[in-house]
Amino acid sequence: MNQLRVLQVVTHMERGGLESMLMNYYRYIDREKIQFDFLVHRQERAAYDDEIEAMGGKIYRLPRLVPWSKAYLTALNRFFDEHPEYRIVHVHQDCLSSVILKAAQQHNIPVRIAHSHNANQDRNLKYPIKLWCRRSIPRCATHLFACGKDAGDWMFGGASYQIINNAIDTTAYTYDTNKRVELRRQLGLADELVIGHVGRFN
């Protein structure tokens, strides 16, 4: 049986939200049938790199994604020239996904997925450029995915998209009385009220 290799395009595989979601899928897919490889935009190794390679994934490195950089675009196109084996590209670069998707389209990659993980972008100096790049995503992608309605509506406007719920290994969150007692002992909490926060503050 031929193994299908899917190219996941990310900034780097640190322990962020979308990276953790990807790893949750990656750990449980049938890797005899489907393999994930990763195109990252950092030269240094990241938190999940060892695990990816242990599961048979390849990691390719490009310079930082700068949409107006001739050096970046040259490196991106060279990558696709050298790797015609990829027939599915799954891009997680928010508004700048269009840069990769357009190159993939020009290299006749038949399945080009844009995946929205946010309902907004930082309003910094690059914000107008990101909004301009966002407009062409539906034209360059063959499939539009979002983690939720807000993320899909913001990224894709009126274009039709599919919501892909983030994968979570629920067994990691199963209540365990022994762990509760031990952790409270380690933290010196005894029976005090503890208020927890799950998520980020940004």
Feature-to-residue mapping (PLM):
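Membrane-interface segments of envelope glycosyltransferases acting on lipid-linked substrates or membrane lipids
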Residues: 1-202
